[in-house]
């Protein structure tokens, strides 16, 4: 479709979902005026995917202001577009294609942990993410958390009907708080229908990367803004009569010790866990435990086939209460392990436990199963180093040094060895005492592109 006063100067290519604007029609806030005509300092044509368009406003019969996320600078950008044949028609068309099937001007409550990770969450929100939402005419109510569990207490009492979503600007710890605040409500089933999203701003940003595939806050914000309600599994965690929810991992062994045992290194960001890992490689492994698991499969070929099948299924855009029960098929069986030579026990729901750590290559966001990795301490350094070098792409899935399971639930009992060890739930420290986890299929909701988390090849 052609929208310019001259042929092909302003054109929408619907098959490519792309807007093309000739450089002669574009000017930016920093541009100068020559004879009252804006002269662009960027002497290139503008090509914007429909998805990247945030908003468009009429400024005159033949001119508009256009806000979009730049593919090159990856930030919210604003420009003026002149020589439009009919600005009313142009604005209506662009907003229709930019938000096709998606609610415009969403309302969010935003939790920001100003002290989490490297302490940059507030700056990240204000300089990178917020401009995307404000340019899209979204309403954002910001809450700066002041203490531990502050976000949890607000989420527990939140009027969920007043918002279209929750934004968590921080790391996985803040997201864990929000999830558990919703989980403590009497109406938790209804509350969990409210999408909970993450803008990366902490030392661990795993959920954000799993849900959007983006690292940059502005691009993450764009994916959320243009995202559709998407279900994801949770785990219920029970310990001494207390209940919590997990969206990511439950782990014991060297990974938990590297995570929780390096809390005082949070200023290092995601690098703290890697330093902790290498330091602990030179310590004698002495993790012991008893595990009982309701196993669906321990055959990696079969697990891969299950995963490939789930990849080919059409993504679900909305979850219903009827979805939130554990399927009775495929069949499962109980297995019990007494492990005196453990290196890693890690149970998870999503592929990435960090943006560069694909711990569960066969995990999908809503398959109703928990992925479990067990690594024994035989050939301790060799097996862990081999695994570590392939962690970024999940290549260790085929390693002979690990055991991989798909389970519905498990009961875990640590054995006291006299050494100080840790247990971590979503990267948060929990008592090192017996506990039980069960999958809660499709209980959580987020805003994700194409109504589904990206499932990559194993």
Curated annotation (Swiss-Prot):
Protein name (Swiss-Prot/TrEMBL): Sphingoid long chain base kinase 4
Entry GO CC: cytoplasm; endoplasmic reticulum; endoplasmic reticulum membrane; Golgi apparatus; Golgi membrane; intracellular membrane-bounded organelle; late endosome membrane; membrane
Ligand binding (substrate): 170-173
Residue span, DAGKc domain: 103-241
Organism: Schizosaccharomyces pombe (strain 972 / ATCC 24843) (Fission yeast)
Cellular location(s): Cell membrane; Endoplasmic reticulum membrane; Late endosome membrane; Golgi apparatus membrane
Record-linked SMART domains: DAGKc
Entry function: Catalyzes the phosphorylation of the sphingoid long chain bases dihydrosphingosine (DHS) and phytosphingosine (PHS) to form dihydrosphingosine 1-phosphate (DHS-1P) and phytosphingosine 1-phosphate (PHS-1P) respectively. Involved in the biosynthesis of sphingolipids and ceramides. Involved in heat-induced transient cell cycle arrest. Accumulation of phosphorylated sphingoid long chain bases (LCBPs) stimulates calcium influx and activates calcineurin signaling. Involved in heat-stress resistance.
